Design a protein with these regions (language model features):
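Short, electropositive alpha-helical surface patch
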Residues: 224-230
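Outer-membrane beta-barrel transmembrane domain signature
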Residues: 21-86, 145-211, 217-220, 231-233
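Glycine- and aromatic-enriched membrane insertion/assembly motifs of diderm outer-membrane
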Residues: 64-66, 71, 80-135, 140-141
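Short acidic/glycine-enriched loop/turn segments that link adjacent beta-strands
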Residues: 115, 221-222
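Sec-dependent N-terminal signal peptides
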Residues: 4-14
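Membrane-embedded beta-strand positions in outer-membrane beta-barrel channels/transporters
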Residues: 90-94, 120-122, 155-157, 197-199, ...
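Sec/Tat signal peptide C-region and signal peptidase I cleavage site
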Residues: 14-20
Length: 233
């Protein structure tokens, strides 16, 4: 299963990562204390990670598991004078299962690509409001780092979806809050802030074990795209 997840990640991310700069090196090359807008960089980083909150909108009941390979692509905001790429690219591996009887989903996610390492997770809850409308809620925490900074990311999200044949369109809202602190500088600098996030997406379930998904995300200052594949075991 791990090998399959790795193959999915490589397949989804290789073309994009080939065009992307190393996030750690890019920060080192463009960050200047007192001049660079660390708050704007932190806000964009929160949005980049927060887009992963709902990668498929569904989970299998334990011992079943949903394993996803996700790619986030986020455009740096106009105030971010640190990131040099037109878009920042970051893939994630995500594992999710649901606790029997409680209906609570448990999510683990992480990445170690493009100079950025992150490990996190959270809890989700799904309910049917009316016969054709499903609601999902989630709360997450992620701890990330490069060689030049560390960051903590907190998020909460809510999503509404409906299933028509093999298609599940959905719309969601969320809020990302994060703290960042540079490392290796004298003195180091820190920043913290948050921003709301809106999302619209589509899941496609062509086979019982396979789900594909794409979504568009907009924040107060920027926007991004996310997509990938999920496998149910």
């Amino acid at each position: 299963m791990k090998k399959l997840a790795l193959l999915l990640t490589v397949f989804l991310t290789a073309p994009l990562l080939a065009l992307a700069d190393n996030m750690g090196n890019d920060f080192r090359d463009h960050y200047v204390r007192g001049t660079s807008n660390l708050k704007a960089y932190n806000r964009d980083l929160n949005g980049l990670v927060g887009m992963v909150d709902f990668h498929t909108g569904r989970a299998k009941v334990f011992p079943g598991i949903n394993l996803g390979a996700n790619v986030s692509v986020f455009k740096p905001s106009s105030g971010n004078n640190i990131s040099s790429d037109s878009y920042t690219v970051l893939p994630f591996l995500i594992a999710e299962t649901k606790i029997p009887y409680l209906g609570v989903g448990v999510v683990a996610r992480g990445t170690d690509v493009n100079g950025y390492r992150s490990l996190g997770g959270g809890l989700t809850y799904q309910m049917t409001l009316i016969e054709f409308l499903n609601l999902s809620f989630g709360a997450f925490y992620d701890n990330g780092r490069t060689d030049w900074y560390r960051n903590d990311h907190y998020s909460a999200s809510a999503i509404a979806s409906t299933t028509i044949l093999m298609f599940t369109p959905y719309i969601g809202v969320g809020y990302d809050y994060g703290k960042i602190k540079t490392r290796g500088y004298d003195p180091n600098e820190s920043a913290s802030n948050g921003t709301p996030r809106g999302m619209v997406g589509l899941n496609v379930n062509p086979f019982p074990l396979l789900t594909g998904f794409v979504a568009y995300t907009v924040t107060k200052d920027s926007h991004g795209f996310t997509g990938g594949l999920g496998l149910n075991f």
